[in-house]
């Protein structure tokens, strides 16, 4: 049976990507009846759009953070040995 994507407000990017990969795998196997394949494809399109939205939101957040710290000097990350 086709899986429906969860509500966009509760699903993170990684979960969306995993669900999309599962759908792609099922479609590539070619074992689904036509109607189920169409439902999976439709869900895949929704998940792809949701993933794109998540990436755009992350990019916007990064741009805002970079603008706020425009005067701050960036330094390389130095991990601490613990």
From Swiss-Prot:
Cellular location(s): Cytoplasm
UniProt KW Hydrolase keyword: yes
GO (cellular component) term, any one: cytosol
GO biological process, one term: DNA catabolic process
Top-level class of the enzyme under EC nomenclature: hydrolase
Primary residence: cytoplasm
Key words, A-Z: Cytoplasm, Exonuclease, Hydrolase, Nuclease
Catalytic activity: Exonucleolytic cleavage in either 5'- to 3'- or 3'- to 5'-direction to yield nucleoside 5'-phosphates
Enzyme Commission designation: 3.1.11.6
Leader sequence segment: none
GO molecular function: exodeoxyribonuclease VII activity
Coiled-coil annotated spans: none
Pfam families to which the protein is assigned, alphabetical: Exonuc_VII_S
Function: Bidirectionally degrades single-stranded DNA into large acid-insoluble oligonucleotides, which are then degraded further into small acid-soluble oligonucleotides.
Assembly and binders: Heterooligomer composed of large and small subunits.
NCBIfam families: PRK00977.1-1 (NF002137), PRK00977.1-4 (NF002140), xseB (TIGR01280)
Family, per entry: Belongs to the XseB family.
Name the UniProt record assigns to this protein: Exodeoxyribonuclease 7 small subunit
């Amino acid at each position: 049976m086709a899986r429906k994507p969860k509500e966009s407000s509760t699903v993170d990017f990684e979960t969306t990507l995993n669900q999309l990969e599962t759908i792609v795998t099922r479609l590539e196997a070619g074992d689904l009846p036509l109607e189920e394949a169409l439902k999976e494809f439709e869900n895949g399109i929704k998940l792809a759009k949701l993933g794109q939205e998540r990436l755009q939101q992350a990019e916007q957040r990064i741009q805002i953070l970079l603008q706020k710290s425009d005067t701050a000097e960036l330094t390389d990350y130095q991990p601490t040995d613990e």
